[in-house]
Amino acid sequence: TGASSGIGRALAQKFSDEGWKVAISARRQNLLNEIAKEENIYAFPLDVTDENKVKEVFANILTVFKEVDLCVFCSGIYDPKLEQEINLNQIKKVIDINFFGVLNCIKSVEEYFKNKKNGHISIVSSVAAYRGLPNSSGYGPSKAALTNLTESLYFDFKKHNVRISLVSPGFIK
């Protein structure tokens, strides 16, 4: 998820370059279609906040790919201009996408990976999870919640031979 720009897009292109078949998803279909012109990349438009759509898209990916080995959940939003003041609606939107959206994605693949008894789920968080930053009243807490969630799920997934990992990059453009 989150493959229309930034880290998600770079990862999709890197995996494709290495010969992987890559399913990408994000809200911005025009950007997805541009990326999907590359070999081995298939676009699946998705709003991660829609739990039913997330399940539907994963089912569609399984139909096309037959098997999934790795899921990278990289969806997220951050706009420091919108977080200069505490705005509950903006904070709820950020947490809904950055935390609950990723949780929807994890939930949609959980049964598949546990039954397969193999696979890897990688969550992209942020250094903002570990330290408060200016203009980050929604973003930082959403990433901190992801970090804690991943650490908690590690124990449950490990029993099924499924790896779950967290990456916390610094600032990018």
Language-model-derived ranges and their functions:
Residues 106, 142:
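Active-site helix of classical SDR
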Residues 84, 133-137:
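Active-site loop immediately N-terminal to the catalytic Tyr-X3-Lys motif
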